[in-house]
């Protein structure tokens, strides 16, 4: 049997890293003898998270472009040239059969170098609105795996495969883990649990909202798992108490999802895909600070299917407490949201993506 080699690149945030790890895990299941190498950006979270998942990773000296003129921006051409050279070296030495990119700074130079070397590449686009890197990479990519319809205006139509986004397999059937999850966090099994997710780095506006509403939550007998993000943990750890679990990063996502009765979340593509699998009532608060407001578009797709509630940051002060209290009191609404969001789940997305990769071997 041929011993295949795969290079994967995805990083910057959990939304790019975990899809890459999920794809690697599925490839490993199907090709136990395969060799894997990840390529990330130096000093980004993938340099920790990928080795924790059991894979080797090499770092490139690369960063994104800022929106204003900075020293970092002036360094960008040098970093890009350096990363392209290093990517070529990595590819020449490792000799991969296929290179897979799930987004993040390092995937650009890596897939560009692979395409130039004639190695098949697969782009996995999580969002309803692609970033500039994936638009450029799509020209040479062999397949583009997407999670949303109507992306023909960004990518060559003949290369697009609608697969859904890869999700962690431990999120399937989380209902069986509720008792274990409640015990793990030292929660009261008789109280409603609110899970607050601001993304792996954190969300300032969501943190401000939770701080403001904290006493309101506690007065309604709600306990909270509050993932404030590593950027904000020092500011909010003082609120940690029996009924408020403040954490910077969540390692066991299956446990927090299992414990949750209601979830407040950003609407990054990977989070949305996970929440569809999990099937809990969700209030989406999209980040307005993203390209083409794609988080709002991600959330609207769920709201149109009557599977979630959407509140813009500008609406939080006037509407959040009313909307949250109404949802908390309405079991019928909670069940309706859960049932509808679950209909949008694609639990086999990772397997479908791997089938596309296998076609290139």
Swiss-Prot record:
CDD domains of this UniProt entry?
A: GT28_MurG (cd03785)
Report the locations given in the UniProt record. Answer: Cell inner membrane
Residues binding UDP-N-acetyl-alpha-D-glucosamine: 13-15, 127, 168, 200, 250, 295
| Reactions accelerated catalytically | di-trans,octa-cis-undecaprenyl diphospho-N-acetyl-alpha-D-muramoyl-L-alanyl-D-glutamyl-meso-2,6-diaminopimeloyl-D-alanyl-D-alanine + UDP-N-acetyl-alpha-D-glucosamine = di-trans,octa-cis-undecaprenyl diphospho-[N-acetyl-alpha-D-glucosaminyl-(1->4)]-N-acetyl-alpha-D-muramoyl-L-alanyl-D-glutamyl-meso-2,6-diaminopimeloyl-D-alanyl-D-alanine + UDP + H(+)
One MF term in GO for this entry?
UDP-N-acetyl-D-glucosamine:N-acetylmuramoyl-L-alanyl-D-glutamyl-meso-2,6-diaminopimelyl-D-alanyl-D-alanine-diphosphoundecaprenol 4-beta-N-acetylglucosaminlytransferase activity
Which UniProt key words apply to this protein?
Answer: Cell cycle, Cell division, Cell inner membrane, Cell membrane, Cell shape, Cell wall biogenesis/degradation, Glycosyltransferase, Membrane, Peptidoglycan synthesis, Transferase
Q: What is this protein called?
A: UDP-N-acetylglucosamine--N-acetylmuramyl-(pentapeptide) pyrophosphoryl-undecaprenol N-acetylglucosamine transferase
Output the lineage of the source organism.
Answer: Bacteria, Pseudomonadati, Bacteroidota, Flavobacteriia, Flavobacteriales
The gene it comes from is murG
């Amino acid at each position: 049997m041929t011993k295949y080699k795969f290079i994967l690149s995805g990083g910057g945030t959990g939304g790019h890293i975990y899809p890459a790890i999920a794809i690697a895990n599925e490839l490993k299941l199907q090709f136990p003898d395969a060799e894997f190498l990840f390529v990330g950006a130096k000093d980004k979270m993938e340099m920790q998270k990928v080795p924790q998942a059991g894979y080797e990773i090499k770092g490139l000296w690369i960063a994104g472009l800022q929106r204003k003129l900075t020293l970092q921006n002036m360094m960008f051409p040098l970093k890009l040239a350096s990363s392209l050279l290093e990517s070529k070296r990595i590819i020449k030495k490792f000799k991969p059969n296929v290179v897979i990119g799930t987004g993040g700074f390092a995937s650009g130079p890596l897939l560009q170098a692979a395409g130039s070397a004639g190695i098949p590449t697969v782009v996995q686009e999580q969002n309803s609105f692609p970033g500039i890197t994936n638009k450029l990479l799509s020209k040479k990519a062999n397949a583009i795996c997407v999670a949303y319809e109507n992306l023909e205006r960004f990518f060559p139509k003949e290369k697009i495969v609608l697969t859904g986004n890869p999700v962690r397999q431990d999120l399937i059937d989380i209902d069986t883990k509720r008792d274990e999850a409640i015990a793990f966090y030292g929660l009261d099994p008789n109280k409603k649990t609110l899970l607050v997710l601001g993304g792996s780095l954190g969300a300032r506006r969501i943190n401000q909202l939770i701080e403001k509403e904290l006493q309101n939550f506690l007065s309604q007998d709600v306990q909270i798992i509050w993932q404030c993000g590593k950027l904000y943990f020092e500011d909010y750890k003082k609120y940690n108490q029996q009924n408020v679990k403040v954490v910077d990063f969540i390692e066991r996502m299956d446990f927090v999802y299992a414990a949750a009765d209601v979830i407040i979340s950003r609407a990054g593509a990977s989070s949305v895909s996970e929440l569809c699998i999990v099937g809990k009532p969700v209030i989406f608060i999209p980040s307005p600070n993203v390209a083409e407001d794609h988080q709002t578009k991600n959330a609207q797709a769920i709201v149109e299917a009557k599977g979630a509630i959407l509140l813009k940051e500008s609406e939080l002060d006037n509407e959040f407490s009313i909307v949250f209290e109404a949802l908390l009191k309405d079991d019928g609404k909670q069940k309706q949201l859960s049932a509808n969001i679950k209909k949008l789940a694609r639990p086999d997305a990772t397997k479908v993506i791997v089938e596309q990769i296998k076609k290139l071997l």
